[in-house]
Amino acid sequence: METKLPPASTPTSPSSPGLSPVPPPDKVDGFSRRSLRRARPRRSHSSSQFRYQSNQQELTPLPLLKDVPASELHELLSRKLAQCGVMFDFLDCVADLKGKEVKRAALNELVECVGSTRGVLIEPVYPDIIRMISVNIFRTLPPSENPEFDPEEDEPNLEPSWPHLQLVYEFFLRFLESPDFQPSVAKRYVDQKFVLMLLELFDSEDPREREYLKTILHRVYGKFLGLRAYIRKQCNHIFLRFIYELEHFNGVAELLEILGSIINGFALPLKTEHKQFLVRVLIPLHSVKSLSVFHAQLAYCVVQFLEKDATLTEHVIRGLLKYWPKTCTQKEVMFLGEMEEILDVIEPSQFVKIQEPLFKQVARCVSSPHFQVAERALYFWNNEYILSLIEDNCHTVLPAVFGTLYQVSKEHWNQTIVSLIYNVLKTFMEMNGKLFDELTASYKLEKQQEQQKAQERQELWRGLEELRLRRLQGTQGAKEAPVPRPTPQVAASGGQS
């Protein structure tokens, strides 16, 4: 089903009379680039146009599969598969309308046949089926027309040949799901090269195509045991190139969704290969700029790993703290949400190992001037399981956050945040009143000492300033005083000859 997207406004050229005047450089806000950008309109940019055969023969309708005797069924099926391998130019809406309709009808019939007719998938038709699928779906994807393409703001380029391409994908899916499907026969044609080309298609901008590819690759992973390790390896390569080289790949969310299902089926104990995938691929994926596009799927994969092996918790949390965003509040809120999901499944023995660095980071988030970050961090205390972990380790957690909570409660500009902090402090006081009183007294004493030191510094600087002024006045006075002229010495004369 096509995703409904809001209509985009057409960009105005610099010479257009309706263009707003450009503000002077000193008035431009460098932080509002995203808000000033206009979403590019949806355009059809097909790669299938380069595969169009201009001198092809005109297609003619063939008899229906249900109307021929069983002895002629497979021969007619092969002819229809060959007919569906003919490509058309969909950028020209009025070209070859009859041929396009003949192919569409044939594809519809193939979809219905393979999904409902038993005994049609015999060994001789496998190469014809894979050939027809390959001709239609495998192509060089066009480069993105917008180098700054933002999936959240810009319209994707949709595939113009989708009326045919969708039916090919549907046929492929039903072919894989058919009760008559034989992986032992299909593995001669669905090999590593085929899978590699299938993975490359995940970079398509068309979300409808990526949705089909996600389901198909999952079926391939389940049917072909010999290809599983290869599929995981190639997914690793795609992610690593995305992190360290390209920083752009449209199908990351779909691939992570497949991997989430795969991780859920991993046998225990986990292999070293799987643990390395978590540490070297999934954790560094948190560092990319477009994290918001696939963060939900990524967080699911991480949590699945921790549910499989609790000993990985420390590696994961320290990795997230390493990549914690410093300037992007949107990503910071996502990190806090993922951290709460991790704490929901953490073992108490693992919590002890990471509680201090974790809650120091939570305290920094509470002190953030961005109220959404502070609010999301304070919501940790609304989680009953996290609250029980904090209560069991109150002597470590409370000293790590108390100073920040107390200070922010006096200084934060947002009254909602102040109210939430008061609730957290009240919870701590009920948990361990004695420790709370000790920390309160210690905090106040520390503040008094800081004020005393600040006052001593001010007095020291004031004394130094007075000393400088006295020396300056002394130097100026010495310069203004008259300099005595030297008296010439008279030669002694006593009448001596």
Swiss-Prot record:
Ubiquitinated by CUL3-KLHL15 complex; this modification leads to proteasomal degradation. Disulfide bonds: none annotated. One of its GO terms (biological process) is positive regulation of transcription by RNA polymerase II. Keywords: Cytoplasm, Phosphoprotein, Ubl conjugation. Residues 1-55, 473-497 are annotated as: Disordered. One of its GO terms (cellular component) is nucleus. Widely expressed at the mRNA level, with highest levels in cerebellum and lung. Its main location: cytoplasm. GO terms for molecular function: protein phosphatase activator activity. It is found in: Cytoplasm. Residues 1-19 have a biased composition (Low complexity). Residues 34-45 have a biased composition (Basic residues). The modification Phosphoserine is found at residues 32, 35, 44, 46-48. InterPro entries: ARM-like, ARM-type_fold, PP2A_B56. The keyword Zinc does not apply. Component of the serine/threonine-protein phosphatase 2A complex (PP2A). This complex consists of a common heterodimeric core enzyme, composed of a 36 kDa catalytic subunit (subunit C) and a 65 kDa constant scaffold subunit (PR65 or subunit A), that associates with a variety of regulatory subunits. Proteins that associate with the core dimer include three families of regulatory subunits B (the R2/B/PR55/B55, R3/B''/PR72/PR130/PR59 and R5/B'/B56 families), the 48 kDa variable regulatory subunit, viral proteins, and cell signaling molecules. Interacts with SGO1. Interacts with AKT1. As the regulatory component of the serine/threonine-protein phosphatase 2A (PP2A) holoenzyme, modulates substrate specificity, subcellular localization, and responsiveness to phosphorylation. The phosphorylated form mediates the interaction between PP2A and AKT1, leading to AKT1 dephosphorylation. Belongs to the phosphatase 2A regulatory subunit B56 family. This is Serine/threonine-protein phosphatase 2A 56 kDa regulatory subunit beta isoform. The gene is Ppp2r5b.
